[in-house]
Amino acid sequence: SKSFKVEPGVTYPITVGGGGAKGPVARPAGDKGSPGSNSVFSTITSAGGGYGAGGSQQPGTDGGSGGSGGGGGYDANGDGGAGNTPPVSPPQGNNGGDASSSAGAGGGGAAQAGTSTTSPAPNNANGGPGGDGSPSTISGSDVTRAGGGGGAGYGGGANPITRAQGGAGGGGQGAITNEGPHAGQKVAATAG
């Protein structure tokens, strides 16, 4: 890690940013989540998280790039967003996972990439977990931050899905809705 010399009596601007937002399950076509905002300390900037992709056969279902990338959306096999964007050393985050036709992928975390998904039986497809965040002592105690969000999933009939877990350090779970003639459950992809 790099050091930053703090001078007594000098005021330094600080902005606390955030992760990207999840993408929607249903249409309108091409809709997606929103990117996160940057964190800034004086001359040092850490990029906000990439947005989560939408699902339900929408175009543009790739996750957004950012400090960590958002997870790809299901139905259209969306790719995960690139982490560490723009590139810096040491890296500020990891890639989002790639999605299958049945389940969305997890968003990337500061310490770990989001989990990609495969295409299992259509009535039992869990989303990918989010990547774990990294521990930080900036507040004076050891706290894990910047976890990636859990991905999207589909389950119907007698095969309900299990919520995809967010990564350690604040990664959110996907929200579940019931849709369709078989009361299938779909989870909105969350961001990294």
State each model region's role:
Residues 1-192:
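Low-complexity, glycine/proline-biased repetitive segments and flexible coils/loops
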